């Protein structure tokens, strides 16, 4: 009898924490269902191209599909049209068009589930219809082939943002992970920024070198974003932002989307970024057309085979958000998962359906529902409205 009573006492003692945990989960799902959730960066279009997946179905692997976007409360994913930096000139443009076509096939196949958004008003209308509002971006300035006409063409195709560099420096801007060639932004690079401001295209400074970042802020007349970067104070990798950079971005009115790559969130995982960078930057295939695409496909599947869970956890992502809020302010942080572009993910944040786990972590840190709405989407929406327009 005494042992039975003792067990009952232990169970009763546990009940408040069990109930509290369930309450937090329920509240998190409620918030995610009612927030206008924006994820500032994913690489899911690669899966459409290389694996011919149907994003309308819940997939058995990968990190994003339409059902899991709804489950995670992410209604506005930024789909990156990313072309590896070993594609040069017209080949990079051709491949960008291939990716744009692949995304169009998704939109055409599921018009009742997903629609292209090209303005803030589009986003609000589409989400109001319980559909996914797809925002398209270009991830790498090499994809304009040093031609402002190509940049303008991308904008007319509904692309709202461009990352100025990727892993390598290009002809007009230095990358954070490439050999510095220009001491930041060249005169043509400054023209690119001016043109993006003029045509209503968001400047994305993820991937750029520190010097390029500060050069951009000297040139731009509009807020910029770091679509998928995190805190260098947590993981000392060049892709992350220093506290001074965070303050400067806040003064600009911009937003940093916290990257969920484990290597960006926990120093123990930092070697993974070095692996990815060294692998791509070492590649110089002397190929073109179909042969180059086949080479890229081989690299894609080899990289996908490296997928695993790292030392980082969802708590590290919350800690990074917390740090940015303290340094830059609540108005200047969002999420930029990099899902389907990362191979080392945090515990409890393995795909987009797990975003409510991050909401729970933020609630446990004392963030209000209004705070979380800003972090989960309103801050990015503000920049879209200010740069792209209604």
Enumerate the language-model features and the residues they cover:
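Distinct, well-ordered alpha-helical segments
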Residues: 51, 147-151, 212-222
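N-terminal hydrophobic targeting/anchoring segments and the immediately downstream early-domain regions
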Residues: 18-183, 232, 236-390
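Alpha-helix-loop-beta-strand connector modules within alpha/beta enzyme cores
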Residues: 182-198, 216-226, 358-361
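Bacterial N-terminal signal peptides
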Residues: 6-16
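Short, contiguous, pocket-lining structural segments
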Residues: 181-188, 204-209, 241
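Substrate-binding cleft of carbohydrate-active enzyme catalytic domains
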Residues: 194-205, 209-215, 243-251
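His/Asp/Glu-rich metal/cofactor-coordinating catalytic motifs and the adjacent surface-exposed loops
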Residues: 218-228, 232-234, 239-240
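Positively charged n-region of N-terminal signal peptides that target proteins for export
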Residues: 1-4
